[in-house]
């Protein structure tokens, strides 16, 4: 029965076609429904600073919803990725951009644009940019300030910016009356691994302007710090024949003839109380002395306040307190 066999083969062939079509529809591989891959172009980097940049590019989504991100890092292996963002579903090229942060100064970075759509993932060409150097800057403080005459102090600070570590710097001083200009004090020193430094200073005899500057190029100069020198004062007590009175005497270094001494009673939690005073008199080429009587109204801790009048070479200071009973 030839007709019967031909009909049976035709039915089987038709069934096979239907089953194949169903399989393609289930797997999403129907030729008519296949999505084209997006096209991408990695653009240039803009707004590049020492710690951030904006990466740019173009994405053509080919009419289907597409996302994009940027890969970036210090090598062609990248290692970092920006957040996934929508690029739309246009049939034309669309400009995209993302800002990245946390970058290192003076460093070359690789980056590329990557688009992700139903038709696949496509990466653009690799491009590079270099972050700029952080300009060097100096900050410093002196401690203690004021410093007591004859005592050491320190000039400490930081050289910040690219290349601030292990950099040669020098300390410079311009002593009172600040007309001689800045002169280098001591030898150059190297900053530490994080740009920090500390200059010890012993022997400053008058108020001085201080600064730190780099050695070589680029020349970077710190703000000026005024280091003041307080007179050194001592005070002692001696009994007198006059009832209710004591004699307070002491020295002032350096010599400050004409300065005024005030005797003060100290009261915890309250302002000091003036109890009289006396002028400072010349004693030697390097020190002055004072001596004066004070009425002792009550026992307690007393100190001497030395008010200098040398037109700015030194600043006033207190003696250490003494107990008078």
Model-derived regions, located:
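Alpha-helical and His/Cys-centered functional microenvironments
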Residues: 9, 13, 33
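Generic alpha-helix initiation/capping and coil-helix boundary signal
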Residues: 13-16, 46, 50, 150, ...
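Bacterial N-terminal signal peptides
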Residues: 14-27
């Amino acid at each position: 029965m030839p007709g019967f066999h031909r009909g049976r083969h035709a039915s089987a062939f038709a069934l096979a076609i239907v089953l194949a079509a169903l399989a393609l529809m289930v797997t999403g591989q129907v030729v008519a429904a296949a999505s084209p891959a997006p096209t991408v172009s990695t653009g240039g980097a803009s707004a590049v600073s020492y710690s951030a940049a904006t990466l740019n590019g173009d994405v053509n989504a080919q009419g289907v919803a597409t996302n994009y991100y940027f890969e970036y890092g210090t090598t062609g292996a990248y290692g970092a990725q920006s957040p996934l963002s929508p690029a739309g579903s246009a049939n034309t090229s669309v400009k995209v951009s993302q800002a990245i942060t946390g970058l290192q100064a003076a460093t070359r970075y690789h980056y590329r644009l990557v688009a992700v759509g139903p038709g696949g993932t496509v990466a653009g060409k690799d491009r590079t940019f270099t972050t700029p150097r952080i300009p060097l800057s100096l900050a410093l403080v002196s401690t203690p300030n004021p410093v007591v005459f004859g005592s050491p102090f320190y000039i400490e600070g930081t050289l910040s910016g690219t290349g601030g570590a292990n950099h040669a710097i020098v300390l410079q001083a311009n002593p009172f009356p600040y007309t001689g200009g800045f002169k280098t004090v001591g030898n150059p020193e190297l900053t530490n691994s994080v740009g920090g430094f500390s200059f010890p200073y012993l022997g400053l005899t008058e108020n001085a302007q201080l600064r730190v500057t780099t050695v070589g190029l680029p020349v970077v100069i710190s703000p000026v710090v005024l280091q003041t020198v307080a007179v050194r004062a001592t005070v002692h007590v001696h009994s007198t024949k006059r009832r209710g009175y004591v004699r307070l005497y002491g020295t002032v270094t350096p010599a400050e003839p004409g300065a005024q001494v005030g005797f003060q009673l100290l009261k915890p939690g309250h302002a000091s109380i003036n109890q009289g005073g006396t002028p400072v008199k010349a004693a030697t080429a390097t020190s002055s002395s004072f001596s004066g009587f004070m009425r002792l109204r009550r026992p307690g801790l007393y100190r001497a306040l030395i008010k200098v009048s040398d037109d700015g070479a030194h600043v006033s200071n207190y003696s250490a307190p003494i107990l008078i009973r």
